[in-house]
Amino acid sequence: MRVRRLSLITLSIFWSLFLPLSSCFAAKNEIPLKEGAWNITLQINPPTSDFLPIVQMLCLSQTEPVPIPAKKEGCRLLTKEIEGNTVFWVAECREKEFVTRSVGNATYDSNKVEGAVQTMTSATGKETEMRTYTLTGKRQGNCR
């Protein structure tokens, strides 16, 4: 009887310690992205006077953390992967004569983001253009 009681006490202590701990590990893998409206800037790298930075306001969330306008007509997100604080993606935009593929990454820290995007633009009968951009951004508030 004494052994059985000791086992029950040990088991109850184990479960009272294990369950809260296991819920920490079972939690959904989320990046430290505060959802809302984000002001995203893409600056060509290295900076030149010919290319002004591309600035856009995007609504970002845990389900849509990629800081590019993939909802634009002719654009689609091909892959998205999350590792720790960083989102990696491949996207493609098709216009009449051009196809632009972008490969990028964005590392979040609550209200700010930093990363890089490499684009490859090809057009029929023209040489493929490759560009590298530095990506920065800050959360501005709630989405409208």
What are these regions (language model features)?
Residues N39-R76:
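Short, solvent-exposed loop/hinge segments that bridge or flank secondary-structure elements
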Residues V90-T107:
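Mid-chain, well-packed structural core segment of small domains
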Residues C24-A37, E81:
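N-terminal helix-cap/turn-to-beta initiation motif at the start of protein domains
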Residues I40-L42, F88-E95, A116-S122:
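Short beta-strand segments that buttress and anchor functional surface loops
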Residues F98-V103, A116-Q118, E129-Y133:
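Short, surface-exposed coil-to-beta transition loops
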Residues A123-R144:
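Edge beta-strand at a domain terminus
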Residues I9-P20:
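Bacterial N-terminal signal peptides
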Residues M1-L6:
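N-terminal secretory signal peptides that target proteins for export/translocation
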